[in-house]
Amino acid sequence: MDAKLLELLVCPVTKGPLRFDREHQELVSRSARLAYPVRDGIPVLLEAEARTLDDDELED
């Protein structure tokens, strides 16, 4: 994930920052407790496509 692109992207739900999880290929919004998939290098920032994070994942 391009660092400059990551600086521009925000969570569509909270407008907060996103963190790239390279292992899972996801953009993580801690404030929304959601992980958005990155498919073929393209972030899919749709709430319906995101998965909910559990407490253990938020501690990482």
Swiss-Prot record:
Cellular component, GO annotation: cytosol
Family membership noted in the UniProt record: Belongs to the UPF0434 family.
Classification via HAMAP family: UPF0434
Designated name of the protein: UPF0434 protein Daci_3569
